[in-house]
């Protein structure tokens, strides 16, 4: 059993990273200085002062294993076991982790950045799930305070669309993992995350959809079921249990009933950004 409660005075700035991602605040404590510096560079846009956080703060403690295991050539999803008290145990090829039932504490034993990143993603996905939200593999772009989230299979054009939008001067919230959640009385929100291209910013989510290629760019309505199938494939499942799957299905269903389902058919040119700008400006 690991004692993971935060000390009353909070962690010192040089011993921990305090991150704020999509309204979720987490402190990451890493003993290895080199790894801590690497994480600080990676998460630089999302680092905040721990003393200014009035909301609930989660804590992740990462330590080196007693006996190191070799990193695999090809990684698979970790095995997940839910304990009777609701805690989760994750077992990867070269790391192990324990997450408390309330999502506020995690202990990771492993080497390098990957175990820490993996557990952070699970913690964020669980926090979003408690809000009725999702963590989605996709690209989210924003214009005049409104955002559109697009998801799809590998090669669908998510990174390409993000690059085209950035070239047009648009704001890319994220082009790898996008956080979305319902805000009581305010509709859905979309926010960037630190992975790959990501901004510490959020916007009102006004459309969710899929991508397709063509020589002419256009924004068109799409059946919610078609978007839903792709959304479920690309939403990060925080725990592979009936509870986790049920929460994901419920959140996806609500999202598709409250946010416009669309399809962006786009060419690899400036017309893609123009189609998005027009739709979001009039949405």
How would you name each of these model-derived features?
Residues 156-158:
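Conserved glycine(s) of the Walker
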Residues 161:
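Hydrophobic positions on the alpha1 helix immediately C-terminal to the Walker A/P-loop
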């Amino acid at each position: 059993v690991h004692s993971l409660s935060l000390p009353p005075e909070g962690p010192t700035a040089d011993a921990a990273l305090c991150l704020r991602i999509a309204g979720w605040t987490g402190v990451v404590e890493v003993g290895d200085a080199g790894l801590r510096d690497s994480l600080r560079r990676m998460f630089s846009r999302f680092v905040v002062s721990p003393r200014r956080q009035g909301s609930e703060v989660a804590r992740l403690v990462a330590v080196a294993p007693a006996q190191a295991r070799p990193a695999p050539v090809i990684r698979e999803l970790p095995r997940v076991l839910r304990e009777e008290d609701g805690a989760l145990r994750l077992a990867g090829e070269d790391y192990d982790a324990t997450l408390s039932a309330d999502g506020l504490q995690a202990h990771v034993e492993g080497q390098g950045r990957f175990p820490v990143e993996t557990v952070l993603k699970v913690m964020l996905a669980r926090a979003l799930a408690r809000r009725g939200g999702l963590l989605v593999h996709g690209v989210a772009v924003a214009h005049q305070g409104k955002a559109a989230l697009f998801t799809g299979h590998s090669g669908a054009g998510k990174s390409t669309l993000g690059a085209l939008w950035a070239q047009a001067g648009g704001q890319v919230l994220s082009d790898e993992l996008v956080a979305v959640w319902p805000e009581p009385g305010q509709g859905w929100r979309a926010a960037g995350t630190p992975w790959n291209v990501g901004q510490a910013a959020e916007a009102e989510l006004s459309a969710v959809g899929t991508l397709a290629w063509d020589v002419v760019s256009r924004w068109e309505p799409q059946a919610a079921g078609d978007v839903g199938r792709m959304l479920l494939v690309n939403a990060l499942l925080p725990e592979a249990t009936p509870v986790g799957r049920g929460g994901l299905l419920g959140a996806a269903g609500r999202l598709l009933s409250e946010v416009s389902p669309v399809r962006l058919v786009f060419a690899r040119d400036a017309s893609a950004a123009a189609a998005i700008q027009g739709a979001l400006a009039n949405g």
